[in-house]
From Swiss-Prot:
SUPFAM superfamilies: Adenine nucleotide alpha hydrolases-like. This is tRNA(Ile)-lysidine synthase. It catalyses: cytidine(34) in tRNA(Ile2) + L-lysine + ATP = lysidine(34) in tRNA(Ile2) + AMP + diphosphate + H(+). It is found in: Cytoplasm. The N-terminal region contains the highly conserved SGGXDS motif, predicted to be a P-loop motif involved in ATP binding. GO terms for cellular component: cytoplasm. Gene3D superfamilies: HUPs. It comes from Mesorhizobium japonicum (strain LMG 29417 / CECT 9101 / MAFF 303099). Its EC number is 6.3.4.19. One of its GO terms (molecular function) is tRNA(Ile)-lysidine synthase activity. InterPro entries: Rossmann-like_a/b/a_fold (IPR014729), TilS/TtcA_N (IPR011063), tRNA_Ile_lys_synt (IPR012094), tRNA_Ile_lys_synt_N (IPR012795). Belongs to the tRNA(Ile)-lysidine synthase family. Ligates lysine onto the cytidine present at position 34 of the AUA codon-specific tRNA(Ile) that contains the anticodon CAU, in an ATP-dependent manner. Cytidine is converted to lysidine, thus changing the amino acid specificity of the tRNA from methionine to isoleucine. GO terms for biological process: tRNA modification.
Length: 454
């Protein structure tokens, strides 16, 4: 059911934990302005002492953006709300501008949140935005309807950014027209961004087409998204259960899958395999559904060695093993603290006294490691360790206990690659299962009631 008259009722914010404050992303448009005022009303009504910080991102892409940011600052000053304006600086891409602007926006919002010790970012995405997103994804790939709703689920009510800050969208059930009615009752205006009607971009084209449809079309699209979200969550839960049953990590960088995977439900098994392939290979996106399904069929036929998503798939008597392929590993480069290496490892430097070079361990160094023979072939362990990061100047003094590259001057913690940047709440279950498997950092608790990572 769509919310058509937003107010201070509990339906909008009562399920969100604001204990540690919130950063509200406010552009000055109607949706984000209404969100800000609704949040302010909620904080005042509940007597919350937590900080509400409005942040406006000036992308610097058109005239008038600075004036709009100033208008937001003025409104915040009038309403007693803390406000900051952050600017997207540097060169802008000639293609893919909307995506680049989105990435820059979330990066700046996260920086602002971290500076205040706030782990929650709230955005004003509406039911209209959700319908547009679903239609855009459907138009891009007609096969999405057969993929248990992964894309057709649209935007998640919450998304974990960089495995640290939660981005929450409390207005996904609220129409833009209702928000504007609310602002009129408050006697508050808003800015109109001309790019929102510039049909040179995909979203404005979809928005224009949707405006010509009946209200029933909007309702049906959102109903589709809701059903797809349920199916995506169910598939993720099945995949998570499967990962916990059949996956293990005999050595750093090496995942073993029990052949029981091949007799499990095909849909859950293929989804679990895709997530693990992307994680082992350090890929930001899951491998292609069709190619993954074809690989699954080949695995059912017997032993093989193949590559997909930068991952070597080695099926032999000892089990089904996944590891990063040697091709395309990062070249030696200066180590930078708090960065992601090869899409797979979060690098933390414990010694900042001088420049350090980080590089893959390499096959030659891996061959010198003393590895006890066990259930897992030593050759597989060495191949996996060869793709792990180490310091160039430390090759002769690795001192690696149990064959694992651990140096006191730096730490390399695994990350769940396909979910490391954006983790939709739909996918919490498989993300947590993989994090437990590979030893990634635990997931921070979701601020939404009823959204568990279990």
């Amino acid at each position: 059911m769509l919310d058509t008259e937003p107010d201070l009722s509990t339906r909008l914010f009562s399920h969100i934990d604001f204990t540690h404050g919130a950063v509200a992303a406010v552009s000055g448009g109607s949706d984000s302005t209404a969100l800000l005022l609704l949040l302010k009303h909620h904080f005042d009504r509940t007597g919350s002492s937590a900080k509400l910080l409005a942040v406006t991102i000036d992308h610097g892409l058109r005239q008038g953006s600075a004036a709009e940011a100033q208008a937001v600052a003025k409104l915040c000053a009038e309403r007693g709300i803390a406000h900051r304006t952050l600017t997207w600086t540097g060169r802008k891409p000639s293609t893919g501008l909307p995506a680049a602007a989105r990435d820059a926006r979330y990066h700046l919002l996260a920086e602002a949140a971290r500076a205040e010790g706030i782990g929650l970012i709230v955005t004003g995405h509406t039911a209209d935005d959700q319908a547009e997103t679903v239609l855009m994804r459907h138009a891009r790939d007609r096969e999405l309807a057969d993929l248990a709703g992964r894309g057709l689920a649209g935007m998640a009510p919450a998304t974990l950014y960089d495995w640290r800050e939660w981005i929450v969208r409390p207005l996904l059930g609220t129409r833009r027209s209702a928000l504007r009615d609310f602002l009129r009752r408050e006697h508050v205006g808003w800015a109109e961004d001309p790019t929102n009607i510039d049909e040179a971009f995909e979203r404005p084209r979809v928005r224009a087409a949707l405006a010509g449809e009946s209200a029933g079309h909007m309702e049906n699209t959102l109903r589709l998204a809701g059903q797809a979200a349920v199916e995506r969550g169910q598939l993720g839960a099945s995949a998570a259960n499967l990962i916990r049953r059949i996956a293990s990590q005999p050595s750093t960088g090496l995942i073993r899958l029990d052949p029981a995977l091949l007799i499990a439900d095909d849909q859950a098994a293929i989804y679990a395999l895709r997530i693990l392939l992307a994680t082992a290979g350090g890929a930001a996106f899951l491998p292609d559904q069709a190619r993954s399904a074809a690989l699954f069929v080949r695995l059912k036929a017997g032993f093989l060695c193949a590559t997909l998503s930068r991952t070597v798939v080695d099926f032999r008597h000892a089990g089904l093993f996944l590891r990063r392929e040697a091709r395309g590993l990062p070249p030696a480069a200066t180590a930078v603290d708090n960065t992601i290496w090869d899409g797979r490892r979060h690098i933390t430097l414990n010694d900042m006294s001088g420049a350090l070079l980080i590089a893959p361990l390499g096959a030659a160094a891996a061959r010198r490691l003393a590895i006890d023979d066990g259930e897992t072939p030593a050759s597989l362990i060495r191949a996996a360790l060869a793709a792990e990061p180490t310091l160039l100047q430390a090759f002769e003094n690795l001192g690696l206990p149990q064959g694992e590259p651990r140096l006191p001057v730096f730490a390399a913690r695994p990350v769940v690659s396909p979910f490391a940047r954006f983790l939709p709440s739909f996918d919490l279950a498989p993300a947590r299962a993989v994090a437990e498997l590979i030893g990634a950092s635990p997931l921070p608790a979701s601020p939404l009631g009823g959204h568990s990572a279990d």
